[in-house]
A protein has these predicted regions:
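Anionic-ligand binding patches
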Residues: 118
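Amphipathic alpha-helical segments enriched in hydrophobic/aromatic residues interleaved with Lys/Arg
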Residues: 138-139, 144
Length: 398
């Protein structure tokens, strides 16, 4: 079976990196995170990840090599002569060589884009050496080179990699509710919220901030959905919020649902999160039960609710909110079939993200973007500039 290396460099985009690994592993294709310089790597948002192995100058064991984006990570890969030589060798042997966002800079340095159609983040296209023909497309395949455009297109890019290896991307898309989030047929629905429309029509003031938050706590139990957790933190930090992750298990290094290891910022306790303005619980099939069994976690959600603080839950994280009682009588959504689990709520099956009172909920693994954007709206933050920078509308995100 084909084997994939995802090069993980200091300053990489954590959301891109983990989403790519997540989706490839869901397709049951062996995939390793390969640290460019060390086993432990901190990304652009200072989230620490522990890789499966460290690059030793050779990529011979792999059938596909993938370079995620992030300005710092892309620079490190571009300037690593040993990696450039290994990429050249892999490409010459007909192996798949893939890069997204700013990382095609490394392919340019390796001379792999000459005479090729390719894409990358629009802001770096003029910096790429030995470039072929840049095209304004989400994902481009030319021969054995696959390139992708930007952060919000990490899902589409990952599925293109799965398809190239003969994997079953359709099943993964269905299970991760990809089509609930991304209208790949084209056309981006208007973004209506309970707080108003973004951006506001000319002459109309933006909706007032119904909640105030500067600090957001994100719970990180063992078995959590890594791409959900990290992507939510990424987006909230881009909105200017201070965002810390809290390990709820016995160790600050958290073992996640798809076999990755991520370091939480802090250990959880009710006192540790008491001065935070908002709290979020992501999903993960095995992650919810220990949280529900924890009196400290349940008490924390009730305390946030009683204080009128903003609370968020995604995917199976919504069952944690249900167990704590904070969904009672509120409109909420969750993963497919969760209407039978979120029984105290007014379940909304046809909306990917819902905000009611002080609770924001969303549906599943591909929904961190609409969840985070809805969370921003609940805080009176206009998400459109962030959507623009991340090419969310290019991904036809709802």
């Amino acid at each position: 079976m084909a084997k994939v290396a995802v090069i993980t460099a200091p300053g990489c985009e954590e959301g891109e990196t983990l989403t790519i690994v997540d989706m490839i592993r869901r397709a049951e294709i062996p995939c390793e995170m390969v640290g460019l310089e060390a086993e432990e790597v901190a990304g652009t948002h200072h989230i620490a990840m522990r890789c499966d192995t460290v690059f030793d100058g050779s990529l011979d064991a792999y059938d596909m090599v993938v370079l995620p984006g992030g300005y710092g990570g892309s620079d490190a890969m571009r300037d690593n002569a040993s990696l450039i030589a290994a990429l050249q060798k892999a490409a010459a042997e007909g192996k798949w060589v893939c890069a997204m966002c700013a990382a095609p800079e490394a392919l340019g340095r390796a001379g792999l884009l000459e005479g090729k159609r390719f894409t990358c983040y629009p802001g770096v296209k003029d910096q790429i050496e030995n470039a072929g023909t840049w095209v304004d497309e989400a994902v481009v395949t030319d021969g054995n080179i696959i390139t992708g455009q930007g952060p919000a297109l990490a899902y589409a890019f990952a599925f293109a990699l799965v398809d190239a290896l003969g994997g079953d991307s359709q099943t993964v898309k269905n299970r991760t509710i990809y089509y609930n989030v991304f209208d790949v047929a084209g056309g981006v629905p208007s973004w209506e919220t309970e707080a108003g429309r973004w951006p506001a029509p000319e002459g109309e003031a933006l909706a007032p901030k119904p909640f105030h938050a500067e600090k957001v706590a994100v719970l990180m139990p063992d078995g959590c959905e890594e791409s959900e957790t990290v992507q939510i933190m990424d987006l909230l930090m881009r909105a200017g919020l201070t965002c810390h992750s809290f390990a709820t298990g016995k160790d600050q290094w958290v073992h996640t649902m798809q076999g990755m290891t991520i370091k939480a910022d802090r250990m959880f306790s009710p006192d540790a999160v008491a001065d935070y303005d908002a709290i979020v619980v992501p999903g993960g099939r095995t992650a919810a039960a220990p949280l529900i069994a924890s009196d400290e976690v349940m008490g924390t959600f009730r305390a946030f609710d009683e204080a009128g603080k903003l609370i968020g839950g995604l995917c199976s994280g919504t069952t944690v909110l249900e167990a704590s009682g904070v969904l009672a009588g509120k409109r909420a959504t969750g993963y497919t079939g969760y209407g039978a689990k979120l029984v105290s709520s007014q379940f909304v099956a046809d909306q990917v993200a819902v905000w009611d009172a002080n609770v924001v909920t969303s549906q599943g693994p591909c929904a961190p973007y609409p969840f985070a954007f809805k969370f921003m709206e609940a805080l009176g933050i206009n998400p459109q500039p962030i959507k623009d920078r991340l090419l969310y509308d290019k991904a036809s995100g709802r």
